[in-house]
C-alpha cells in the first residue's frame, strides 16, 4: 500500500511537472516581464490585490495559450528532433490531460483579466484568438506570414499590462506592444534558421527555410530599426523613456552590426548567438523603462 501510494504521488508529480513544461516557463517568464514592465511604466501601483490578479492573469492566460498550442502541434513536435521529447509526443501526458489543463488555465486567465477591467480582458481574448486560431490553426502550417499573427499575440501581455495600469488602451500601451511586435522577428527567425532543416522536414513554412541569410537579415534589421523608432516615439510623447531609448538604440545597433556578419556567412552558430542576444534587448526595455518613469516622477514631485 505504501509503495503504491508513493508511486501514485510520484506519477502525479511527474505529470504536474510535465504540464508546467507545456507552458514553456522561460518564454512565459519573458512575456510576463513585458506585462509587468508595461504595467509599471504605465503608472501601475503596488496594490497587493492588483498585483495578485495581474500575476494570476499573466501566468494562466499566457501559459494556457502556450499549452494549447502544444496540444494542437503535438504531431509536428513528434517529427522535429528538438521537440519530440516534449510531454505530449513522448507520451508523458496524454492529449486529454493537456487539453483539460490548458482549458482550465485559459478560463482562469479570462476571469482574472475581467476582474481587473474590460480592456485587460479584451487583450487576453485577442491573444487567444491571434495565437491559437489565427497563428496555430489557420496560418502556421501554410505560410511564412504566420509570424505576423504570432507577433500580435506575443505583444498582448504588454498591452494588457498597460491597460491594467491606465484603465484603458491608450497610446503608451500600443507603443509598448509595438516594441514587442517588432522585436519578435529577431527572436523567431534566428531560431528558425538554426533549425531550418527540421522545420522543412515538418513542412512548416518559415522564412529562414525558404529564403536566404541576406533576406532574413534585411527584414530583421528593418524590424529592429522600427523598434528603435518606437522607443524614441514613446520618450518624446510621454517625456520619459529617453534613457531607455538610448540603451535600446545601442543594443539594437549592436545587433544589426552582428546581423551584417551573419548575412555574409549564413552560419547556423551565428544565428543561434543572435537568437540568444534577442532576449536581453526586450528585457532591458521592460526593466529600465518603468524604473526611469519612477525616477522622473519622483524628481518632478520632489
Swiss-Prot record:
It catalyses: heme b + (2E,6E)-farnesyl diphosphate + H2O = Fe(II)-heme o + diphosphate. It comes from the Archaea. Pathway: Porphyrin-containing compound metabolism; heme O biosynthesis; heme O from protoheme: step 1/1. GO terms for cellular component: plasma membrane. Its EC number is 2.5.1.141. InterPro entries: Protohaem_IX_farnesylTrfase, UbiA_prenyltransferase, UbiA_prenylTrfase_CS, UbiA_sf. It is found in: Cell membrane. Keywords: Cell membrane, Heme biosynthesis, Membrane, Transferase, Transmembrane, Transmembrane helix. It is a multi-pass membrane protein. The chain crosses the membrane at residues 28-48, 50-70, 93-115, 119-138, 147-167, 172-192, 219-239, 242-262, 271-291. It is an enzyme of class 2 (transferase). Carbon 2 of the heme B porphyrin ring is defined according to the Fischer nomenclature. PANTHER family: PROTOHEME IX FARNESYLTRANSFERASE, MITOCHONDRIAL. Belongs to the UbiA prenyltransferase family. Protoheme IX farnesyltransferase subfamily. Converts heme B (protoheme IX) to heme O by substitution of the vinyl group on carbon 2 of heme B porphyrin ring with a hydroxyethyl farnesyl side group. NCBIfam families: cyoE_ctaB. This is Protoheme IX farnesyltransferase. It comes from Aeropyrum pernix (strain ATCC 700893 / DSM 11879 / JCM 9820 / NBRC 100138 / K1).
Amino acid at each position: 500500500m505504501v509503495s503504491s501510494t508513493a508511486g501514485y504521488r510520484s506519477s502525479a508529480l511527474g505529470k504536474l511537472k510535465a504540464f508546467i513544461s507545456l507552458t514553456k516557463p522561460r518564454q512565459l517568464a519573458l512575456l510576463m516581464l513585458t506585462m509587468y514592465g508595461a504595467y509599471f511604466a504605465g503608472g501601475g501601483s503596488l496594490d497587493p490585490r492588483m498585483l495578485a490578479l495581474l500575476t494570476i492573469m499573466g501566468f494562466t492566460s499566457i501559459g494556457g495559450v502556450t499549452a494549447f498550442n502544444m496540444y494542437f502541434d503535438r504531431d509536428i513536435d513528434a517529427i522535429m528532433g528538438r521537440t519530440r521529447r516534449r510531454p505530449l509526443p513522448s507520451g508523458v501526458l496524454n492529449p486529454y490531460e493537456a487539453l483539460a489543463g490548458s482549458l482550465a488555465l485559459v478560463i482562469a486567465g479570462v476571469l482574472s483579466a475581467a476582474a481587473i477591467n474590460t480592456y485587460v480582458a479584451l487583450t487576453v481574448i485577442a491573444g487567444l484568438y491571434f495565437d491559437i486560431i489565427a497563428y496555430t490553426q489557420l496560418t502556421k502550417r501554410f505560410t511564412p506570414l504566420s509570424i505576423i499573427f504570432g507577433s500580435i499575440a506575443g505583444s498582448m501581455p504588454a498591452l494588457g499590462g498597460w491597460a491594467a495600469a491606465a484603465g484603458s488602451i491608450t497610446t503608451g500601451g500600443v507603443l509598448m506592444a509595438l516594441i514587442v511586435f517588432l522585436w519578435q522577428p529577431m527572436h523567431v527567425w534566428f531560431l528558425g534558421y538554426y533549425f531550418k532543416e527540421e522545420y522543412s522536414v515538418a513542412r512548416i513554412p518559415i522564412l529562414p527555410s525558404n529564403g536566404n541569410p541576406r533576406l532574413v537579415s534585411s527584414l530583421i534589421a528593418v524590424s529592429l530599426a522600427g523598434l528603435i523608432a518606437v522607443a524614441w516615439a514613446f520618450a518624446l510623447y510621454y517625456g520619459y523613456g529617453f534613457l531607455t531609448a538610448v540603451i535600446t538604440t545601442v543594443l539594437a545597433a549592436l545587433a544589426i552590426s552582428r546581423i551584417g556578419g551573419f548575412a555574409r556567412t549564413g552560419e547556423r552558430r551565428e544565428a543561434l548567438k543572435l537568437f540568444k542576444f534577442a532576449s536581453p534587448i526586450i528585457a532591458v526595455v521592460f526593466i529600465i523603462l518603468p524604473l526611469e518613469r519612477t525616477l522622473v516622477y519622483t524628481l518632478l514631485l520632489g
